[in-house]
Amino acid sequence: MISSLWIAKTGLDAQQTNMDVIANNLANVSTNGFKRQRAVFEDLLYQTIRQPGAQSSEQTTLPSGLQIGTGVRPVATERLHSQGNLSQTNNSKDVAIKGQGFFQVMLPDGSSAYTRDGSFQVDQNGQLVTAGGFQVQPAITIPANALSITIGRDGVVSVTQQGQAAPVQVGQLNLTTFMNDTGLESIGENLYTETQSSGAPNESTPGLNGAGLLYQGYVETSNVNVAEELVNMIQVQRAYEINSKAVSTTDQMLQKLTQL
């Protein structure tokens, strides 16, 4: 009888985790390049009273056995790297990725991180950086006298300078792809880092080796579907209520037992 309380409790914990994931998705509905998550669950160990296939007599075996479950637990929060919409900004330093790949940036400790947020800016040294100040890799320096910046679909960065008719190439924006995008670790600030599960980074020119293309003057918006998340929220709410009902029903049954 008591076990049902703990089983229902695992259900409540699982739905709370599910709700946390949905809330985070909705909170980041306006975050550039954000990829929504979904909670993945698995059942816990079973109490086996009769083994499936065990002998019930000399001539017969149990077709299904008797196993009592002990609940559920969250096993993963899978990040879904589907394409977000491209929103036009008309800012020459904004770049959106259409397809696979990430921009590579350098962290303060010299290690690499990866992002889909292409709302770039220029720092005091003319270096192309993210909105958080992380330098884009390979480093790209925009001259102080640049009149305009052009970023091609293939990542070639060129500028027009005063007194020069022809544009001058100042750098190359490459894209990094991974065998398993879901295996990347989210570290906040729209950044991911490589893990053993993601596989090694593969740097490519946009449009080659499976990498996407770049669109200047656009940013990729979040791939969160608000309507879908609200439907998921209703389902979670109902599941939470059902598990709460299981707790209260078990409590009522225990009260009846104590009255005997």
From Swiss-Prot:
Localisation per UniProt entry: Bacterial flagellum basal body
Pfam families, per the entry: Flg_bb_rod (PF00460), Flg_bbr_C (PF06429), LlgE_F_G_D1 (PF22692)
GO BP terms: bacterial-type flagellum-dependent cell motility; bacterial-type flagellum-dependent swarming motility; chemotaxis
Annotated Gene Ontology cellular component terms: bacterial-type flagellum; bacterial-type flagellum basal body, distal rod; bacterial-type flagellum basal body, rod; cell outer membrane
Keyword set, alphabetical order: Bacterial flagellum
Family: Belongs to the flagella basal body rod proteins family.
Quaternary structure, from the entry: The basal body constitutes a major portion of the flagellar organelle and consists of four rings (L,P,S, and M) mounted on a central rod. The rod consists of about 26 subunits of FlgG in the distal portion, and FlgB, FlgC and FlgF are thought to build up the proximal portion of the rod with about 6 subunits each.
Protein name: Flagellar basal-body rod protein FlgG
Organism: Escherichia coli (strain K12)
Upper lineage: Bacteria, Pseudomonadati, Pseudomonadota, Gammaproteobacteria, Enterobacterales
Gene designation: flgG
